[in-house]
UniProtKB/Swiss-Prot annotation:
Component of a multi-subunit COQ enzyme complex. This is Ubiquinone biosynthesis protein COQ4 homolog, mitochondrial. It catalyses: a 4-hydroxy-3-methoxy-5-(all-trans-polyprenyl)benzoate + H(+) = a 2-methoxy-6-(all-trans-polyprenyl)phenol + CO2. It comes from Drosophila erecta. The keyword Oxidoreductase does not apply. Its EC number is 4.1.1.130. It is found in: Mitochondrion inner membrane. Belongs to the COQ4 family. It comes from the Eukaryota. The lineage of its organism: Eukaryota, Metazoa, Ecdysozoa, Arthropoda, Hexapoda. This protein may be expected to contain an N-terminal transit peptide but none has been predicted. Zn(2+) binds at H171, D172, H175, E187. Its cofactor is Zn(2+). Keywords: Lyase, Membrane, Metal-binding, Mitochondrion, Mitochondrion inner membrane, Ubiquinone biosynthesis, Zinc.
């Protein structure tokens, strides 16, 4: 009994030392400076990022959702809504990127899709049944440009900011591989596929509330053909965010669709 009593102060002192050591380690981690940006995207993003509080995030999410509903042409509000409501979905997307070799390369390279980064003259020389040629045709037919996407501003984590940027810049590529135009019927259908594929809340909002703006004839076609097609493809298609589209320009577009599990809607 005497030996146990003599050991007790030593044990208490040991526990105290271990506790102090743990506190010191936590203090070192807490006081460590923020890691330096690792690449050009992160360096630029930290310069342009707008820091907001949790309250401001909720306020922006509510305000942008109302503004987007009142005027769907407010792309700035739609972009704000995507950033203030999509963080959980973006973390899930990041997991899928890291689980894929192709996705890992995207996160390492952080490619951008602009007229300054894509050789469109080269894409125009590709055979018409390639993905690159189909993309150029889509841009011309719908009179759109890859330079029209808004910059991400409100996400704290730069990796998530890149994923949101990547989602926006790949939107027209998704249209291309799905063979959907940019009219309201096509946009709503693509939004359903994107919603089910990415889990982003703004995509669900665009799909649900965008359908309200369809004209009667469009709504009948939507309910009979487009919606069932979009739901089926959204559930069946492989994750689209980890696809390194820029490495697929020369791939036969029919083979690409088959690989991803995409079927094209017969619009006849």
């Amino acid at each position: 009994m005497m030996q146990r009593c003599l050991r007790l102060p030593k044990l208490l002192a040991l526990r105290r030392d271990l506790h102090l050591a743990q506190v010191e380690r936590q203090a070192v981690v807490t006081e460590a400076p923020e890691a330096e940006p690792q690449d050009a995207f992160e360096r630029q993003y930290f310069k342009e990022r707008i820091e907001i509080s949790p309250f401001q995030r909720v306020f922006l999410a509510a305000g942008s959702s109302i503004a987007a509903l009142l005027d769907p042409r407010r792309h700035d509000m739609i972009a704000c809504l995507g950033e203030t409501t999509g963080e959980d979905a973006l973390w899930t997307i990041l997991d899928s990127m890291q689980a894929s070799e192709e996705g890992q390369r995207i996160m390492a390279d952080k490619p951008r899709i602009h007229t300054s980064t894509i050789d469109f003259k080269y894409l125009e020389t590709l055979p018409p049944d390639t993905f690159g040629a189909a993309y150029v045709k889509f841009l011309k037919d719908n009179q759109v440009t890859p330079d029209s996407r808004m910059a991400v501003r409100f996400l704290e984590e730069p990796k998530l900011a890149y994923l949101m940027t990547r989602y926006r810049e790949c939107h027209d590529l998704i249209h291309t591989v799905l063979d959907m135009p940019t009219n309201m019927l096509g946009e709503v259908s693509v939004k359903w596929v994107e919603a089910l594929n990415t889990g982003l809340p703004m995509c669900y909002g665009g799909a649900v509330f965008g359908a309200v703006r369809l004209r009667p004839k469009q709504r009948r076609a939507y309910l009979k053909h487009y919606l069932p097609w979009a739901l089926e493809n959204g559930k069946r298609t492989k994750p689209l965010m980890p696809v390194y589209w820029e490495k697929r320009w020369e791939q036969n577009i029919h083979d690409l669709r088959s690989e991803l599990g995409i079927t094209v809607l017969n619009k006849a």
